[in-house]
Amino acid sequence: MKRFWFLFFLPLSLAAQDTLLIEGRTFVDTLSGTSYGVTVNRTRPVKFIFRNNSVTGENTVGYMLEAGQENVTQYTNNFRGAEITGNKFTWVGDQNANTITHGVFTGYHTDVRVMYNYLDYVPMGIIRKSNGMTDSTGVVAYNIIRNPPAVGVVVKGMNGVRIYNNTFYSEDSLYVGPGIGTWRGLIDIYENDNPVGSAKGAKIKNNIFYTKSQLTNINVMNESCLDGFESDYNIFWCESGEPMFMIAGSRLTFTQWRARGYDLHSMVVNPYFINTVDLVPERRMQWGTPTEFNYGIAASDYWEAGFYPTLVRQGEYWQQGARVYEGDIVIFYWRGKLFDGDTTAIDLKYGKIVINQGEIHIQQ
């Protein structure tokens, strides 16, 4: 097994506000079997920040960033309030649906903020796990999760997890046999069975879900997880038919999902990504709902170790997905007519149309 160990020898009087910062580093793990990847010492309570790093791996078992535990230990919640932001995680191993490599793992720590990251082919992308602990200020927001062989985000036995303004994109197929396709959702929510822990009150808003096949977008595995569950103001698109969902093992179409009371304000619309790497919508997707997390990734930005992504503030009309367009929409024209009903009111020679927060301004 290969591990990247970070050992910080801290005084016995260490305070909870002390900071453990890993920033601007490049990690490449070439072990293809079991590897624990970037493993961080969690024996003391600290403010853990993992920022603007690049992590590449090909391990089929283990982690890319191990910043949590699989069970209750004496180190539980030592990383409460951790921040994992602006990183790029790239997995280059065998594209097999049986691969269980955990990308960003923060088990048994609450209020963790996982934001502005790019995950490329990471088998199990972002894992929020516990024995029924409750998240109150944490969030999974403004991440791009591209082509996860298994699942994009997992909520296992943790209450109150918020999943806002992420972009999910998958070219995968449905599971047809061992190692081929995935049976999981882009988001999986389920109880922890050992030790038993609930996963209530998850909130899924302002995300973009794009699939080539009729994969499951949101998979709520236990009926009990619907207690306090909310999903709305999202964008869904499937190239092969109606977007699909699952509750307690039953597959549901978008129509059936909405009949259960979910995603009533969401839309099925193609975001027309400019390309399938940067995942920038061709136009603004701005039918979202405001949250406290009001900065997204600039449409023109990219990830590089040591550099923080450029962030753009949301406007009055909330944009969905991880990318946020800056400024007004401007359309230049050469000749035109302005109509009032069926009557031509004004001949337009040349100028521009500026669309700002729903208001249209014609400038000549």
Functional labels for PLM-detected ranges:
Residues 6-16:
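Hydrophobic h-region of N-terminal signal peptides that target proteins for export
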Residues 33-39, 61-64, 95-96, 101-103, ...:
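Structural detector of coil-to-beta-strand junctions
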Residues 25, 262, 332-347, 351-364:
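Extracellular beta-strand-rich, repetitive "passenger/adhesive" scaffolds
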Residues 256-332:
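C-terminal accessory segments
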Residues 1-3:
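Positively charged n-region of N-terminal signal peptides that target proteins for export
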Residues 17-30, 44-59, 70-95, 102-105, ...:
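Right-handed parallel beta-helix
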Residues 212-214, 236-243, 297-300:
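Acidic glycine-/aspartate-rich tracts in secreted/extracellular proteins
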Residues 38-40, 69-74, 189-195:
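Short, recurring structural edge motifs at helix starts
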